[in-house]
Amino acid sequence: MKQLYHLTLRHTVLFFKDKGRFLTALITPIVLIVLYMTFLGTVYHDSLDSIVKYFNVSQKTIDAFVNGYLFSSLLAVSCVTVSFCSNMIMVQDKADHKIKDLLIAPVSKTTLALSYFISTLLITMIINITALLACFIVLGTSHFVLPVKDILYCLFDIFLLTLFGASLSSIINYFLITQGQISAVSSVVSAGYGFLCGAYMPISQFTPAVRTFIKFLPGTYGTSLIRNHLLRSLFLKLGTKVPANVMNEIHQNFDTSFKLMGHTVTQSMMYLIMIGTCFLLTLIYIFLNQSKINM
């Protein structure tokens, strides 16, 4: 237990001490913020405004909705991209042959693998909880405060998405052994995941074939969960101003409600998908570390 603690602490400290790696982890969230500041924020504002323009919905409510949508996208992306970057410590140790030194010490392979996994979870949770606090402050400027229940749901959603990101990155990074591979994977994940989870643009804007494909990806439902809970109070407020058919249009346009193969995917189903995926990915990572592949 003491070895696990010290190894986890080592990986975590190394990540935060390396400013380059830390900034790399934040590239995707920064790009997302820039996109929203330059044009996406206006696009979403105009999109919602066009839907509710015939109803008595204040601009403050629309602004709060757009801000909440931005932060839900940012958090959903960060949980995965930051996980990949923080888990690169494991790959870096292999590339620098430091992992051999660690395994020479009286440390089991399982303990070392677990320390990388826990460190990835810890780093990603720290960064995303900080981002969530910033979200609450920004929403507060719109005189909108989330109920405690929704805050707890958001924290649980972040944990689930972080667990998903940590387990997925651990499996992929397990097979990486060089600096070039690190750079390639980081670039692909940073550039691609935002599109795949519907952070850069709503899934409803894609072609039917792409929409269907994305709906089979578990990260899509993690994004939808945090989006639902971050915006739930605003949905309730909008529900008092607009009819049910308009609310349904808002849910469809902003990816908070999905239909898969003709069936509505409820939030309970979304949780089952996310928990089941995390469990399966964690089992695969455990299996890899029990085998004699690579490490």
Protein language model features and the residues they cover:
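Residue-level recognition of transmembrane alpha-helices
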Residues: 7, 25-26, 74, 93, ...
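Hydrophobic alpha-helical transmembrane segments of multi-pass membrane transport/permease proteins
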Residues: 10, 14-48, 66-84, 121, ...
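Junction motif at the cytosolic side of a transmembrane helix
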Residues: 242-295
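Short, membrane-interfacial amphipathic segments enriched in basic
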Residues: 1-9, 209-216
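Transmembrane helix segments
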Residues: 35-44, 173-234
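Hydrophobic alpha-helical transmembrane segments of multi-pass membrane transport proteins
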Residues: 31, 35, 62-141
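Alpha-helical transmembrane segments and their short interhelical loops
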Residues: 109, 117-197, 283
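Perimembrane loop-to-helix junctions flanking transmembrane segments
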Residues: 47-63
